[in-house]
Every structure is written in C-alpha cells, then in structure tokens.
C-alpha cells in the first residue's frame, strides 16, 4: 500500500487531451458549488445559471493551457468569480445578494426570524467591497481553503488569509448586534 496522492481525474483527462470528458467531469463534480458561488455573488438564479454556463465555456476554452496549479475547484471558482464580476459591471443590476436563501412558503415565527437574519446579512454583505464579498463567498459558500482562495484571486496564501480576516471583521461591524 502506498501513500502517494491519487491524481485528480480531471487533471489526468486534461493531460491526455480529453477536454470534453474533463469538462463533463467538472460539471458533475463541481457544478453545484459553482452554482452556489454564482448565486451568492449575483443574487439571481437566472444570472447564476448564465454565469455557470459562461464559467464552464471559459474553462473549456482554457483547458489546453491549464497549468495544474492548485485544485480544479479553485481554478473553476476563480473563473466564476471573474465571470460574475464582469456580469455585475456590465449589467449594473442592484440585485440583492442571496447568500442565505430562505423559502417563502413557511410563515412561522422561525421563518420570519430567518428572513430577517438573511436580509440583515445581505445588507451587510452589500456594504462590503466586491473583493471582500468574493473571498467570503469563496470561503463559506464554495468551501475553498485559504490556499485555494489564494489561487482563485491570484494572491499568495498569507494575503488571502488576511483578506478573509479583514472581510469578516468588516462584516461583523456591518451586522447589527451579534448576528454573526
């Protein structure tokens, strides 16, 4: 038995030049996290779906030049982050962020509290700079490590950790009471 790490199947497919198969595997393994990430950054399911499609299209085009730095998940989230930023710039939509989706069908006291908490979080997130919001979404929604976030935002790991820490501090300041 050996302790050698197994190569990522997507990287293996890329090395073999099997880009179509690699893309299909990306969709299966990372499609859901891309959807959640784009939804959190854009606040609209329709926009998030469009952003995921554009992310996968750009990833497919970039596959021949993939350098293998970091994880595929971090690479894809980095592309998604750029796609979402471009969509926000060009469309200039004042949509709310949907980091904490709450179904509208439940009318109980708990549902009301959850909706109020979600609204407070969206409002606090809207006060952050896009770069601060991005790292929080990559960390809490996409589940990326600080190393993976560093790759996604093209900075070293220490800078990524610092950005996450500062963004959390600003978010805590923006939230009423002890909501976080």
Regions found by a protein language model. Name each.
Residues 30, 51, 163-168:
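Residues within the DNA-recognition helix of helix-turn-helix
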Residues 27-45, 62, 125, 174-177:
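Amphipathic, Lys/Arg- and hydrophobic-enriched alpha-helical face
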Residues 126, 130-134, 142-162, 170-173:
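Helix-turn-helix DNA-binding module
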Residues 2, 100, 114-115, 120-123, ...:
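C-terminal edge and immediately downstream basic/flexible tail or linker adjoining helix-turn-helix-like DNA-binding
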Residues 15-16, 43, 54-71, 90-94, ...:
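Sigma70-family region 2
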Residues 61-68, 78-99, 113-114:
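Arg/Lys-rich amphipathic alpha helix in sigma70-family domain 2
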Residues 36, 50-57, 70-82:
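Structural recognition of an alpha-helix C-terminal capping motif at a helix-to-coil junction
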């Amino acid at each position: 038995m050996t302790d050698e790490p197994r190569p990522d199947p997507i990287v293996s497919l890329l090395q073999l030049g099997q880009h179509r198969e690699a893309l299909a595997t990306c969709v299966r393994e990372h499609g859901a996290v891309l959807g959640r990430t784009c939804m959190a950054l854009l606040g609209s399911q329709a926009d998030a779906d469009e952003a995921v499609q554009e992310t996968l299209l750009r990833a497919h085009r970039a596959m021949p030049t993939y350098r293998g730095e970091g994880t595929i998940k971090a690479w894809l989230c980095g592309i998604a982050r750029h796609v979402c930023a471009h969509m926000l710039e060009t469309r200039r939509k004042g949509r709310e962020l949907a980091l904490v989706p709450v179904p509208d069908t439940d009318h109980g006291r708990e549902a009301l509290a959850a909706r109020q908490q979600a609204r407070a979080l969206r409002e606090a997130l809207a006060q952050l700079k896009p770069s601060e919001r991005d790292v929080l979404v990559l960390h809490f929604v996409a589940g990326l490590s600080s190393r993976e976030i560093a790759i996604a935002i093209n900075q070293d790991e220490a800078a990524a950790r610092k950005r996450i820490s500062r963004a959390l501090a600003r978010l805590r300041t923006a939230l009423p009471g002890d909501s976080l």
